[in-house]
Amino acid sequence: METPVYIIEETLLRRNLALISEVARRTDSEWILAFKAFALWKTFPIFREYISSTTASSLSEARLAFEEFGAKAHTYSPAYKDEEFDDIVRCSSHLTFNSLSQYERFHERAGECSLGLRINPEYSEVETLLYNPCAPGTRFGVTADKLPEQLPSDIRGFHCHCHCESGSEVFERSLQHIEEKFSKWFPQLEWINFGGGHLVTRKDYDTERLVRLMQGFHERYPHLKVIFEPGSAFAWQTGPLVSSVVDIVENKGIRTAILDVSFTCHMPDCLEMPYFPEVRGAQHVEHEVGSSQEPPFHLEGAGGRLYRLGGNSCLSGDWMGYWQFDHELQVGEQIIFEDMIHYTTVKTNTFNGITHPSIAMLHSDGSLELLREFTYEDYRDRMD
């Protein structure tokens, strides 16, 4: 198969789904897929074997849940628009408002949806502000001091999101803050949604701690249904982005392998977070971006070769580095970025008209199926 291509591996996806299904059973809670991290709808038949619902944050995501997943969505949006609201209601089973003003404006049009409010516990351990939903001045959620003692009679639940690829020890501390600030309203509720960012499929995740936390929570609040809505956890380490070396250039002694993919177009979190992805067969070498220090070429003494990896766009900063390989790279050689299924295909763009990677599935029987191939028409029709 030609590169570039995202390859999702069915065996790895089913592994995650089975694990999440077992966690849901042991914690007596519902776990639903957040489309903001993963929305490859051609895989939904597999998901339906393990979960029964999804979460949406826009009309398009809500329609995807209803029309392609086959079940109404748990929907939350920072702000609903008047002209979209009725269609969102049609596609939703649960509807969470970000503010009391949005609730007042729309709740009478919400039909049979189970209504909720997003709360802000004013606590999050997410260090990168770009991904911290509880940072000072955040636009997300209602703080405890703004809630009335008696909630509106049609509010059935609270929604709280304050994690990002977090462990259960972080959730334990977050839960303490949530209960301290908001538990006095729990008797008025039917459900609570603890949001996403619970990375239960990571190898070092302490599942037993989560089970204990939920056992205690259910004992304290036996009437509350508990919901988790991770995204990354479902697609965590389920497949790579495969690229090829198109050219190798050198400037001031720095070698850059230019690839047929782009960090800014196809791996945006690498630049936004930022973080260095794992490259198969290579070792990332720490070197501060923009540093005046010379690149660590002394590491090449062991026979390795050091390269920056550059994207094929005209953005000057569309590169990352350095990686050490055990051989000199050649034009046409494949460079494989591991764990590139979550927060990639949902965030890619066609900046510069760069060819979008195809999407394929490696089935459990070893066959490789092309799910989507992108063409010039996809780029052109965005401007139509």
Model-derived segments and their meaning:
Residues 230-384:
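Charged (often Lys/Glu-rich) extended helix/loop segments that serve as interaction or gating elements
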Residues 1-69, 80, 262, 325-338, ...:
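N-terminal capping/small domains of soluble enzymes
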Residues 123-125, 164, 200, 234, ...:
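Feature marks short, surface-exposed loop/turn motifs that line or immediately flank catalytic pockets
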Residues 29-191, 205, 213-216:
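Active-site-proximal beta-alpha core segment in soluble small-molecule metabolic enzymes
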Residues 35, 162-163, 192-201, 230-233:
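Glycine-rich beta-strand-to-loop/alpha-helix junction loops that act as flexible
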Residues 96, 116-118, 159, 193, ...:
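Structured core elements
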Residues 167-173, 201-210, 237-243, 324-325:
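Short glycine/threonine-rich loop-to-helix capping motif typified by GTGT followed
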